[in-house]
Amino acid sequence: MLRWVLIFLAVAVVAAILGFGGIAGTAAGIAKIIFYIFIILFAISLVVRLLQGNKRL
């Protein structure tokens, strides 16, 4: 699960960079939403991983 969160976080970061940079101005709002959703998912996944202990990825 952590792998997918990292993949989608990377996609969201790229989309956010393009959206915030003015290249895709119409998609900036969507990129911001996706970016923040995946930041939250990443944080949740990280906390769950830390609480589980030393299990393999």
Curated annotation (Swiss-Prot):
Keywords: Cell membrane, Membrane, Transmembrane, Transmembrane helix. The chain crosses the membrane at residues 4-24, 28-48. GO terms for cellular component: plasma membrane. Pfam families: DUF1328. The keyword Nucleus does not apply. The keyword Isomerase does not apply. It is a multi-pass membrane protein. It comes from the Bacteria. Its main location: membrane. It is found in: Cell membrane. Belongs to the UPF0391 family. This is UPF0391 membrane protein IL0696. It comes from Idiomarina loihiensis (strain ATCC BAA-735 / DSM 15497 / L2-TR).
